[in-house]
A protein has these predicted regions:
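ATP-dependent adenylation/nucleotidyltransferase module used to activate substrates
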Residues: 2-205, 228-240, 317
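Flexible helical/loop "lid" subdomain adjacent to adenine-nucleotide binding pockets
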Residues: 45, 53, 63, 185-189, ...
Length: 322
């Protein structure tokens, strides 16, 4: 009943909650605001700026490297960081990284959008492929691995390789921070996944905040400036701004029902009656981080005998074990 009442109230609302001049096009259910196009766009950009400021994600002297896939999130991130960089006195130029996984009928189309966007924004772009790094495309890796009993979802292999490439390239480009397009929905999903798998040590790391390791210089700092914006709002923003992006999901994600997909469905069901649920999860993760910080203090890691990267055991790291 309450939900229907809320919809009715929105349909009868004749003005934007912020400017009070124009008819609204969007009802932000978690705040109760009805927003016109311009106020909605402005609110998204303000949230990004406020998130960066509140959580100390970036500094004026940072050399920012942006991971860009060509999807709605990374395009939104790149566009907004470019605007911020242009308004920041003496700011270093942005650089972007995009990765060609070698997925048939997917990677090349997506990369064309990335190249076009970076050219329009005058952002340096570095493209590297899985094949350059591993001698194989993701299609080839999956074809080999799925013959073994130990086969895991393609996403596991892809994520491991991408993390390494992004980190290595960002350092190669002399970046001080790697900015990625993880949104509030992504952060909430990951938090729930870590709870479900009892990975409290990962929550304790505080990966959603900028945090440098005192024990290794192998990793570049990572930040998520979109982490306070729900996925559906980013989709609306990028369409209202008419920013070109690649919409189709990765074919492997569609073919393989990974747990993350089920968690997303669960979250979307909860949001129907509790639109603030993702914000509650975000705030809860920060509170739990402060509690777990003492228990899971950073300890001296082992190092992979092959690549020298930190690893939890004396054996090869996950990347080198692929």
């Amino acid at each position: 009943m309450k939900e229907n009442k809320g919809r009715k109230a929105f349909s009868e609302q004749g003005e934007c909650s912020l400017c009070h001049n124009i008819k609204p096009i969007y009802n932000r259910r978690h705040s109760g605001q009805n927003l016109c196009k311009d106020c909605f766009i402005s609110s998204i950009e303000k949230i990004i700026n406020k998130t960066i400021s509140k959580y100390d994600l970036l500094t004026p002297i940072d050399k920012i490297v942006v991971g860009v896939s060509g999807g709605k999130d990374s395009i939104t991130l790149l566009y907004n960081l470019k605007q911020i960089q242009e308004k920041t006195y003496n700011a270093k130029p942005l650089s972007a990284i995009s990765i060609d996984e070698g997925i048939e009928n997917y990677s090349s189309t997506r990369l064309n959008i990335v190249k076009e966007t970076c050219k329009e924004l005058n952002v340096e772009l570095k493209v590297v492929s899985f094949k350059e790094y591993t001698t194989k495309t993701l299609d080839q890796i999956v074809a080999i691995q799925e013959k073994h009993e130990s086969f895991r979802y393609p996403c596991n292999y892809c994520a491991t390789i991408k993390r390494r490439i992004l980190n290595d390239l960002a350092k190669e480009l002399e970046g001080t921070v790697l900015a990625l397009g993880h949104n509030l929905t992504d952060v909430s999903e990951t938090y729930l996944m870590n709870i479900l798998y009892n990975r409290l040590h990962l929550i304790a790391r505080g990966n959603i905040l900028r945090k440098s390791s005192n024990l290794t210089d192998k990793y570049i700092d990572r930040v998520f400036p979109l982490m306070k914006i729900p996925e559906h709002e980013i989709e609306l923003y990028v369409n209202l701004k008419k920013l070109k992006y690649y919409g189709p999901l990765c074919p492997f994600r569609k073919e393989h029902p990974i747990l993350r997909k089920r968690v997303l469905h669960f979250l979307n069901e909860l949001k129907k009656t509790s639109p603030e649920i993702e914000f509650n999860l975000f705030n809860g993760s920060l509170e739990l981080l402060s509690v777990l910080g003492e228990k899971y203090k950073e300890t001296a890691p082992h190092y992979c005998p092959k690549c020298g990267y930190p690893t939890p055991s004396p054996t090869k790291c996950r990347y080198c074990s692929l």
